[in-house]
């Protein structure tokens, strides 16, 4: 903008000074400025500029102090405030200065008079002069002349050569037969260029064989030059007008045949046609001789938009082609499709007897579709049962649920307004059912931003069994399979690689499968790949931490699809103790889309941990996700509990197997009985046995059969142990009593453990036979199970009435107080004392005998003897 303003200012200044100089007005009344040798000089020449004051002009107060200043104004010098550049000064009435190295173009020099040394009064202009620097014109070259159409005029153009920087006049002269002469002029300067002139004359076809000569002459102040003569004929310069009114007709609505028609000048004998589909970059060229405005085209594509253009020529071998006509754009009619659809499918089991079949197919290309595809006809057929499912859809996919049994085939055809294509058939097999057909060593490598190179090795099964390979890929993003359908390529069986580029975008992870198909089987291998990757933007979000069976289960949500930035290889779970500065521990998990939880078993119970997760791609690790705190509660170690319990049990059993420790323990426990606890001693008068049999005065007759009954019965209270106390300790054998019917009482053996001592007030030697048979004693009744029986007795049993008192340990004789302490063996007394220690944990002093009101049966009133038993038995 600033440069434009400066150029405009300089132009105005030049114009103003030029007008002043040309008009010879008051600006030059003080003097004159001249230039020698001329105002126009060639490049590299010098010029002398003289500035002279007129008589009686100059500084009136100080005539001797006339200072003449020469200023230079050029287009390429920045002149502030239009003051110019000072190139010379001189004191006097005249001054001459030689200028050199002037640039091409016009340069203005102005002479000024300065009468004061003060800066307040500016110098006064005296006069100025222009000096133009340029070059002589070069001879014009490359002259060509044309006449557009039969009724056009002749126009010629040429190359002027180098710019002269001066005003240069050009003259075009034409001469021909019959003294034909014509010329035109134009000039070139800094504002316009002259390199073409229209002579304004028309050459008729009558002069077709005549020759014409043209010449161009250039003249300026530094010289002149002329071009070489240029000779031509009518056919050489006349160019037909472009054809017009172009149209096309299709024969019988055919999409491949059409007749192109146009209008042309009458003298045209040759036409050139070119046409192409709009999406093409190359033209189909056709030459038509004497076409008379019509030509048949037979190789057009149906339902394709074409562009047509035509050019004309007046002579088969000479002359020039006309310009191309305006374009005609039109679409050819439809025809029935000729292509075969490329079909693929996916299987998914729904339950034990149903499966979902999803069919996919690629659209036909325009050359195969040959029209607008209106719909697709889909057929799914079960071979053995002849079950057929048909449907019509406008989409390129179709899904149907069918039984899992039977062999199925699918076919798809495309239809437009003219017809349908041949159906494409495919057998529905288990694509990944045969492991022997699975390709090996499948790899996916990024080639650039838009494609992925997939390579593999042939399956274990013979290569001849593989009919073709299918490379299938699908973006691993949320959405239905119809919204994001798979893409696939068919690869010949001898190729082991494929470059996939269809719908491949950077920073998106794709699941890639390589299928090897035979006639009736299939095997597949899969891998994930991307064309470009970065570290994920964020980490997985931990949603829950649960504790089960001494393990923590970490649950998370996957990273949103746009933030994954490629294929995720691993998830990492980090944990460390809260407020710990140590490096965290980690667990790396192989990424699987279906997995959203993982167990950890290395955390200590009752310790608070901080956990977080990250994701890893081939480019790096993501930032950490959210942090979660968790304190495992742990679980009691049942193994340690069982082992410790067994050890305690063994120690306890071993300790209580020793009699001394067992007695001490029982004694300690018996002291712990509370005073409110009293063990009730049952009264024999209330027993079932007494109620069943009447009480006699001296004895009770018992049938011996009744002795075989279980005693005591379940209804009776728990039997108590009764200690027998005698004045003289007599060993008595104690064992379970059992006697059979008809055998009476048998002898029994005596053991040390069962020995007791009987207190007898009489001397042993003074006992009579009856007395010895009826020893009055109290038998010690031990606690038995209800199933216990009486053992055989070898001596008669006699019970004599004796006064007694209830005790805590059993029934004692009434004369126990008469027992002398020295008559009892201390050792035996100790053994007797500890044989019947109570197992109660309460103090024995708290026991009280049960007191009944009224008359009751006591042992003093009972007398039982062997004779009575035998008599009852009889």
Swiss-Prot record:
Induction: Following T-cell activation, expression inhibited by IL4 and induced by IFN gamma.
Keyword Transmembrane helix: yes
Modification comment: On IL12 stimulation, phosphorylated on C-terminal tyrosine residues. Phosphorylation of any one of Tyr-757, Tyr-804 or Tyr-811 can activate STAT4, IFN-gamma production, and T-cell proliferation. Tyr-811 is the dominant site of cell proliferation.
Effect of residue 748 to F: No loss of IL12-induced STAT4 activation nor T-cell proliferation. No effect on IFN-gamma production
Modified residues (Phosphotyrosine): 757, 804, 811
Signal peptide: 1-23
Span(s) of short sequence motif Box 1 motif: 677-685
Its membrane topology: Single-pass type I membrane protein
GO biological process, one term: positive regulation of type II interferon production
Keywords (A to Z) from UniProt: Disulfide bond, Glycoprotein, Membrane, Phosphoprotein, Receptor, Repeat, Signal, Transmembrane, Transmembrane helix
Highest taxon of the lineage: Eukaryota
Extracellular side: 24-637
Effect of residue 811 to F: No loss of IL12-induced STAT4 activation. Greatly reduced IL12-induced T-cell proliferation and IFN-gamma production
Domain Fibronectin type-III: 139-237, 242-335, 336-430, 438-530, 536-635
Main location: membrane
Transmembrane domains' residue ranges: 638-658
Outcome of mutating residue 677 to F: No loss of IL12-induced STAT4 activation nor T-cell proliferation. No effect on IFN-gamma production
A Pfam match: fn3
Further facts: Lps-defective mice C57BL/10ScCr (Cr) mice carry a mutation in the IL12RB2 gene leading to the production of a truncated IL12 receptor beta 2 chain resulting in malfunction of the IL12-mediated IFN-gamma response.
PANTHER family per UniProt: INTERLEUKIN-27 RECEPTOR SUBUNIT ALPHA (PTHR48423:SF1)
Family indicated by similarity: Belongs to the type I cytokine receptor family. Type 2 subfamily.
Main function: Receptor for interleukin-12. This subunit is the signaling component coupling to the JAK2/STAT4 pathway. Promotes the proliferation of T-cells as well as NK cells. Induces the promotion of T-cells towards the Th1 phenotype by strongly enhancing IFN-gamma production. Can also activate STAT3.
Domain comment, as recorded: The WSXWS motif appears to be necessary for proper protein folding and thereby efficient intracellular transport and cell-surface receptor binding.
Protein name as it appears in the record: Interleukin-12 receptor subunit beta-2
Organism: Mus musculus (Mouse)
């Amino acid at each position: 903008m600033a440069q434009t303003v400066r150029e405009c200012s300089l132009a105005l200044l030049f114009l103003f000074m030029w007008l002043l100089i040309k008009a010879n007005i008051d600006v030059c009344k003080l003097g004159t400025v001249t230039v020698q040798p001329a105002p126009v000089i060639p490049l590299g020449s010098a010029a002398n500029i003289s500035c002279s004051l007129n008589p009686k002009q100059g500084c009136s107060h100080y005539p001797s102090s006339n200072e003449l200043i020469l200023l230079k104004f050029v287009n390429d010098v920045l002149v502030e405030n239009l003051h110019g550049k000072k190139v010379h000064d001189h004191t006097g009435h005249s001054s001459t200065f030689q200028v050199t190295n002037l640039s091409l173009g016009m340069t203005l020099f102005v002479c000024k008079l300065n009468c004061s040394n003060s800066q307040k009064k500016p110098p006064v202009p005296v006069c100025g002069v222009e000096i133009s620097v340029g070059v002589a014109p070069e001879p014009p070259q490359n002259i060509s002349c044309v006449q557009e159409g039969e009724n056009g005029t002749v126009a010629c153009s040429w190359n002027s050569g180098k710019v002269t920087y001066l005003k240069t006049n050009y003259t075009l002269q034409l001469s021909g037969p019959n003294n034909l002469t014509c010329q035109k002029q134009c000039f070139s300067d800094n504002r316009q260029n002259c390199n073409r002139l229209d002579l304004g004359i028309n050459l008729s076809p009558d002069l077709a064989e005549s020759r014409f000569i043209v010449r161009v002459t250039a003249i300026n102040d530094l010289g002149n030059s002329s071009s070489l003569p240029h000779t031509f004929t009518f056919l050489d310069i006349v160019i037909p007008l472009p054809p017009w009114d172009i149209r096309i007709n299709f024969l019988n609505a055919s999409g491949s045949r059409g007749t192109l028609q146009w209008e042309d000048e009458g003298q045209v004998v040759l036409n050139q046609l070119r046409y192409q589909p709009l999406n093409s970059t190359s033209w189909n060229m056709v030459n038509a001789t004497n076409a008379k405005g019509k030509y048949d085209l037979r190789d057009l594509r149906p339902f394709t938009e074409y562009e047509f253009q035509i050019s004309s020529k007046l002579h088969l071998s000479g002359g020039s082609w006309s310009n191309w006509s305006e374009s005609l754009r039109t679409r050819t009619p439809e025809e029935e499709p000729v292509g075969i659809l490329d079909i693929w499918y996916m299987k998914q089991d729904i339950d034990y007897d149903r499966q979902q079949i999803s069919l996919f197919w690629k659209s036909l290309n325009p050359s195969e579709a040959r029209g607008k595809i209106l719909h697709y006809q889909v057929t799914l057929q079960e071979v053995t049962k002849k079950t057929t499912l048909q449907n019509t859809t406008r989409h390129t996919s179709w899904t149907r649920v069918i039984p899992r049994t039977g062999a199925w085939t699918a076919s798809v055809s495309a239809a437009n307004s003219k017809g349908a294509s041949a159906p494409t058939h495919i057998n529905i097999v288990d694509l990944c059912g045969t492991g022997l057909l699975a390709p090996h060593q499948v790899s996916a490598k990024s080639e650039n931003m838009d494609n992925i190179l997939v390579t593999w090795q042939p399956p274990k099964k013979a290569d001849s069994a593989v009919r073709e390979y299918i490379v299938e890929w699908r973006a691993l993003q949320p959405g239905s399979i119809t919204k994001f359908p798979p893409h696939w390529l068919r690869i010949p069986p001898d190729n082991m690689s494929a470059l996939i580029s269809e719908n491949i975008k950077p920073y998106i992870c794709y699941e890639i499968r390589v299928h090897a198909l035979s006639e009736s089987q299939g095997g597949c291998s899969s891998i994930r790949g991307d064309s470009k990757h970065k570290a994920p933007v964020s980490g997985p979000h931990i949603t829950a931490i649960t504790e089960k069976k001494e393990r923590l289960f970490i649950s998370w949500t996957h990273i949103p699809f746009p933030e994954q930035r490629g294929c995720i290889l691993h998830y990492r779970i980090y944990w460390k103790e809260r407020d710990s500065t140590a490096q965290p521990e980690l667990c790396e998990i192989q990424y699987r889309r279906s997995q959203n939880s993982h167990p950890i078993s290395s955390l200590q119970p009752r310790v608070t941990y901080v956990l977080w997760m990250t994701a890893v791609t081939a480019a790096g690790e993501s930032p950490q996700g959210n942090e979660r705190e968790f304190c495992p509660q742990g679980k009691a170690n049942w193994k340690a509990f069982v082992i410790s319990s067994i050890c305690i049990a063994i120690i306890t059993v071993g300790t209580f197997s020793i009699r001394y420790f067992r007695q001490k323990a029982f004694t300690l426990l018996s002291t712990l009985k509370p005073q409110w606890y009293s063990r009730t001693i049952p009264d024999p008068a209330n027993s079932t046995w007494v109620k069943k049999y009447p009480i006699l005065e001296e004895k009770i007759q018992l049938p011996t059969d009744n002795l075989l009954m279980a005693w005591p019965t379940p209804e009776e209270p728990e039997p108590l142990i009764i200690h027998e106390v005698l004045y003289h300790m007599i060993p008595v054998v104690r064992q379970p009593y059992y006697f059979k019917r008809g055998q009476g009482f048998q002898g029994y053996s005596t053991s040390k453990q069962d020995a007791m001592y009987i207190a007898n007030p009489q001397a042993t030697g003074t006992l009579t036979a009856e007395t010895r048979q009826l020893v009055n004693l109290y038998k010690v009744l031990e606690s038995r199970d209800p199933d216990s029986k009486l053992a055989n007795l070898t001596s008669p049993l006699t019970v004599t009435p004796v006064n007694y008192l209830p005790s805590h340990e059993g029934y004692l004789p009434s004369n126990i107080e008469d027992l002398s302490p020295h008559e009892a063996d201390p050792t035996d007394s100790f053994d007797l004392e500890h044989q019947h220690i109570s197992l109660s944990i309460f103090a024995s002093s708290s026991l009280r005998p049960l007191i009944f009101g009224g008359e009751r049966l006591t042992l003093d009133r009972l007398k039982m003897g062997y004779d009575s038993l035998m008599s009852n038995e009889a």
